[in-house]
């Protein structure tokens, strides 16, 4: 089982820990309470940018959980549009419903949160 916890930007890995405009989530594997991933994102009014996602062994389910956590965080703060700019997890982002729009993966948060998961259920 995994747990995703919002963190202050200072708790993110460098160089993200130096950018006060960022928000973040850290994922933990509850079997041994070890850190298994993190993501960084920025809220920009009604839109957000997911700029960094990292998971141990590039685990798709962990990446999905981090992306969904970030989307939920933004959605709860009146953000409507999400742009996925991270280098990792692009395949997972596409499964969730992000679509290429002028070279940037984009989607509206309500639709993205309804997207297919990595297990295809």
Where are these regions (language model features)?
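Short amphipathic alpha-helix that is part of the acyltransferase structural core
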Residues: 1-28, 116-121
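Short, exposed beta-strand/loop patches in secreted or surface proteins that constitute
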Residues: 40-43, 82, 97-98
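A conserved short alpha-helix in the GNAT/GCN5 acetyltransferase fold that borders
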Residues: 67-75
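Conserved GNAT acetyl-CoA-binding A-motif
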Residues: 74-87
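C-terminal "cap" of GNAT-fold acetyltransferases
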Residues: 102-121
């Amino acid at each position: 089982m995994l747990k995703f916890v919002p963190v202050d930007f200072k708790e993110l890995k460098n160089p993200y820990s130096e950018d006060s405009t960022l928000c973040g989530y850290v994922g933990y594997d509850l079997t041994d309470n070890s850190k298994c991933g993190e993501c960084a994102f920025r809220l920009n009014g009604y839109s957000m940018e997911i700029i960094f996602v990292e998971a141990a062994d590039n685990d798709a389910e962990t990446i999905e959980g981090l992306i969904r956590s970030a989307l939920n965080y933004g959605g709860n703060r009146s953000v409507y549009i999400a742009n996925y700019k991270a280098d990792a997890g692009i395949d997972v982002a596409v499964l969730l419903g992000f679509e290429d729009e002028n070279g940037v993966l984009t989607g509206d948060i309500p639709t993205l949160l309804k997207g297919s998961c990595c297990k295809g259920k």
